[in-house]
Amino acid sequence: MGNNENGGISFCVFVVVIGFGTGAVAQEPANQSEAVTSLEEIVVTGGRSAQQISEIARTIYVVDSDQIQAEARSGKTLQQILGETIPSFDPASDGARTSFGQNLRGRPPLILVDGVSMNSARSLSRQFDAIDPFNIERVEVLSGATAIYGGNATGGIINIITKKGKDAEPGLHAEVTGGMGSGFAGSQDFDRNAAGAVTYNSENWDARLSIAGNRTGAFYDGSGTLLIPDITQTSTAFNERIDLMGSIGYQIDDDRRVEFSGQYFDSKQDSDYGLYYGPFFAALADPSLFETRSGYESDFNPQTRRSMLNVTYTDNDVFGQQLLLQGSYRTERIKFHPFPASGNSETGPYFYGSSQDTDYYGIRAALVAEPTDALKITYGIDADMDSFTARQNIFDMVAAGQSGGLDFNTIGKTGLYPSIDVSTVAGFAEASYEATDRLTLNGGVRYQFVNTEVSDFIGAAQQVAILQGRATSADTIPGGEVNYDAALFSAGATYQLTNTQQVYANFSQGFELPDPAKYYGIGNYSFSGGHYTLVNSVNVGDSALEAIKTNSFEIGYRLDDGTFNLETAAYYSLSDRSINLNRSSLAVEIIDRERRVYGIEGKAGVKLDHGFDVGVLGHWVRTEVKGADGWEKDSVGSASVSKLGGYVGWTNDALSLRFSGQHIFELTDAQNFTIDDYTLFDLTGGYRFENTDTTLNFGIHNVFDTDYTTVWGSRAKALYGGLADESVFDYKGRGRTFAVSLTKVF
């Protein structure tokens, strides 16, 4: 059981009280004309063309700029904001850099920034380590497998829309913000951030240039103990981040517009603290020797560095249709923490640091036609190429052993995974038809062709042995090419019960190509005379990686009358295969076992008298794989957790306050690994100085200083516990922290 059982019960009572309160003192419902505006005023672009929410037969949430900025300035990350706002999006793990296992409806989502995919051939889970919240205009979340985007959208789409000059007031304006945060647990428990932007908006031209920076200090848990360093996916403690972003748009005429945008993002950890393994790694045999110590030095540190260019062109009159064109380029380098490897009889144990590079090119073209007032058709093509390479820094084991794992100096570099090139070409079409004044039908089809090229590769451990001089040569594991194709379909219907209420149902398919880099390039070798002879291997010719197809179903209801809003849905998704991460080798394995995820999600809010508003959200989810004796619980390494959240807010012309909480329910899998339950509360607020156009934001996070293991920490114990004692991977969340910031608009 978790360590917050009483807190969970209290929190459930807190949410129930909110729920009953929402119906007790609500204002009178808005009039009918206001109600129509409430449902139809929000337009989302997460699909292939802009659509009103009222036309879409699926669950959609929009987190607007005001909420994102208020929460971020009060000390929350984007992952935390979305995890507390989107019912079916898993909770964030405070302090973690990774988003691994932070699923949407129990499956990985496709993350987009202005429509450009942040997902790659290598599933690195750094998609949110990509942008400062200062630069975000809104986030659109489309839940469930998405046929129209196809690959790697089995959980849905999270589309991050950045701020542009066209969204600003006319003329030249500027904005600056600065803030700090601390839990006051030690002299290095201090975070700070600053950002600034200049915007220009005229009749034809618009532009925005911004820079945002952040530096974090030490992280402490609820008991006041320095958090253990995350040697698996790394944390954001002792981290420096910079996000430089610019865009320029030109309105050619009433119908045509072109826009260019670019970004440079760098997030790097540089810590004086490391995981102490004991003298000459004695803690691997005696886990009691593991501890966090100062004096850590390494010439290789965790980092996410990304550059991105994006150009879009729209023409509202191409033979009576709207043309949408987009071209994008993204390059990134992702580095991890030095990590132990068992090696083989020649290399012995060694430490390596993983560095993985991706170059992504994408082109998207779509035409939007409206042959009749009732029919809208969007059709087009996509093409993209993803090139991936990986290498590993090998460290001096003498220096590392003498320091107990606190001193890592590179002695050479070798390959880590085979190089992977994934090329995709797809055609798609989707239609929306207003069958009656109240009934809208939706349907779509996508045909996708994927070519994967895998390079020849010498096993990673064998390359290390050659570097060490303990071997002279090795056979290569053969690469090759493999092609995939899939036809994906979607169909749905939305029925408007009243001008403020809708019911909808949807079927959609998703396509997923599991991580090829961690699947290929694994071989068994024999060793003789300094040469490694390949005995057998996982390669393209003998055991090509199989794709996974997912069918997703949902029914839902939404209501928004301007005072009360509610959205709820039940869903079921079934995939034909399962992905397993080998606990000893960390290799990806594809298993011919069906995997299903089903659940119910909901979110409700109401505006009350005297400036109060309250809301609740919840998600009940089950993830199962099919075994010989029927369905059984999936591993906590990837299965989603159920959650319940709520808030009470109050605002007047100047001051706003919000007290919120979230309870994470315990989850145990078939192997008895557990994600413990916990409950967290936050208090955030802001005060606006109208005369100076300045806003003061503040926040208290983890108000009751709860000591808990994050969801990622529980997952990491299940995933990596075969390599070292599970205590090494028990990543806890931060204790009580305070944050304050000041924002000035010119």
Swiss-Prot record:
Domain TBDR plug: 52-163
Motif (TonB C-terminal box): 729-746
Protein's recorded name: Rhizobactin receptor
Homology family: Belongs to the TonB-dependent receptor family.
The organism's taxonomic lineage, starting at the top: Bacteria, Pseudomonadati, Pseudomonadota, Alphaproteobacteria, Hyphomicrobiales
Gene Ontology cellular component terms for the protein in this record: cell outer membrane
Entry-linked CDD domains: ligand_gated_channel (cd01347)
Function: Receptor for the siderophore rhizobactin.
Main location: membrane
Signal peptide range: 1-26
Record domain TBDR beta-barrel: where: 169-746
Pfam families, sorted: Plug, TonB_dep_Rec_b-barrel
Organism: Rhizobium meliloti (strain 1021)
NCBIfam families named among the record's database cross-references: TonB-siderophor
Gene: rhtA
Keywords: Cell outer membrane, Ion transport, Iron, Iron transport, Membrane, Plasmid, Receptor, Signal, TonB box, Transmembrane, Transmembrane beta strand, Transport
